[in-house]
Amino acid sequence: MVSADKVVVSDFMGNIVADPKTYTVDWDASAAEKGGWDSFMDKEIHEGPAAVQRTLLGRLGKDGNLNLDEVRIDEHDFKAIDKIIVIACGTAAYAGMVAKYAIEHWVRIPVEVELAHEFRYRDPILTPRTLVVAISQSGETMDTLMALRHAREQGSKVLAICNTQGASIPRESDAVLYTHAGPEVAVASTKAFVAQITAAYVLGLYLAQVKGAMFRDEIAQALDSLKDMPRKIQWVLDTQTKTVHDAAAQMVDAKSFLFLGRHVGYPVAMEGALKLKEIAYTFTEGFAAGELKHGPIALVDEGEPVVFIVPPARGRNVLHAKVISGIEEVKARGAYIIAVAEENDPDVERYADVVFWRPACPTLMSRWWTWCRCSYSPWTWPS
């Protein structure tokens, strides 16, 4: 209770708390203002580079090792982890799906991604050696909160990836990685998505470090790629906006869209589809590109916009060729092809009607600026 001369803290039963715990909220009220942008979503998309940069800040110690000071789980417990289960909803779940590919590749332990609202109703297999990672921007997602409580009851450690200090999910978890993305006011998550992927990647590299699954120079190389993300995201925002505007103007009357991707491009396709559903109220479906011939191709009509998340050809020739084959299939049905691809990909230029380019990078690092193109579009602007 706040009065003119004092503040009284009580519990839910009305009992006064004599010495309540306090903490400082590191938050600037101006961060919740538009600051000259037309919308909060537009502003927050452009804050993506800074969100990634802040999430990485201070993670590398002087000795060259990853340093996660805020993680309150003993290193011995991390070494014993033999399975990871990510629990989340919506955009956070897609961030977890992206991270699954990287963590399994780096740490060589299985990673499951569960929708939090389904998790506790299916009798999941949990042990003290299972690490449950709860991802939530707000830290108050009730489905995720209930799921993490269930996991702790079963004896598993829970680590939260969260953007809001002092929220319920980080408070009730065994450990927390804060994303430091700043307030996200828009309904549709943007900068929090890339910050969540960044934090999950840092967690994966830390696990690889404590388990000895990667050499130090390999971890350093992956971290260097992560540190380069803000610059490359900014490149996309600076160079591709007009192409997106022009394409959106041409497709503004489209009644439905398909988003397709493979590997880490699959969850990004799902996230891109979610953005159009949330903001443009347009019927949009995201699929794994390999599922195209198993049903979704029946939805493709003349002029239907189909967005392909194209992996780089370098080192992923088979994956790249499969996606190009999918583009050819829907092109034969008269679809309008929008491709998100690496710079100067000649196969994409040959078949796509419009291309949103991204800089060259390793496959596991290519989803940040792909997200930019899926999110930063007048299709998602309110009329």
Tell me the role of every PLM-derived stretch.
Residues 1-383:
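A SIS-like phosphosugar-recognition module
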